[in-house]
Amino acid sequence: MDIVIVGSLAYDDLETDSGSVKNSLGGSGTFAGLAAAFHTSRRQDPGGTLPLGLVCAIGEDFDDADFQLLKDAGLNMDGIETVPGGQTFRWHGKYEGDMAQAITIETQQNVLDGYQPKVPAAWWAPRVLFLANNHPSIQAHVLDQCEGAKYIALDSMNLWIDIAFEELSSVMRRINLAILNDNEVRMIAKDENLIRAGESIRNGESLTGGK
């Protein structure tokens, strides 16, 4: 497998200055998967499954049309686990102004509460492993399975920095690339100077346990 993405498939309620939407297909795995499929498909023959695997848990309420949308994009869905009787992860959030920062109003972990991803054995050594925005404990469990990954990237958000920073710090010490916005960098480093903040994250000084 060229690329393995482990993230959330979710339904979101979103509020912005210009409007709102309920039960919108969302989740870090959804957006990362579709973006990767878009760029990968340009190098493939039309149709078929791309060398791009998605790993997540969903509930029985996950819409068949949404599942098919991801499959039609070319994503390999063998890593998707449907939890009997479960409800899909839900997030209610708000974006204001330049929409650079997500404000979490409510999170319903549902099937992701205690979830331990099962990455298919054939996917344990991908060229790229992308740990899309998710609870750091889930990201750590994936790293334990995919020890053969050639390059590992991670995304996170202010919610996990607030409530699971020690776990996030541990995961960040095991990756090649962290994708963070300005606000998240400042939150982790506790420094308004982005150059200093970025360096203190890179060298581990800002993470739990220090250098």
Protein language model annotation of sequence segments:
Residues 1-4:
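Extreme N-terminal starter segment of soluble prokaryotic enzymes
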Residues 11-23, 40-130, 144-148:
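Conserved N-terminal subdomain of the carbohydrate kinase-like
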Residues 66, 138-145, 166-170:
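A short acidic, amphipathic alpha-helical/loop segment
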Residues 59-61, 133-138, 157-161:
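Short beta->alpha connector loops
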Residues 109-114, 156-163:
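Short gly/ser/thr-rich secondary-structure transition/capping motifs
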Residues 147-151, 158-211:
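Conserved phosphate/ATP/ADP-binding segment of small-molecule kinases
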Residues 19-37:
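Short catalytic helix/loop segments, enriched in acidic residues and glycine
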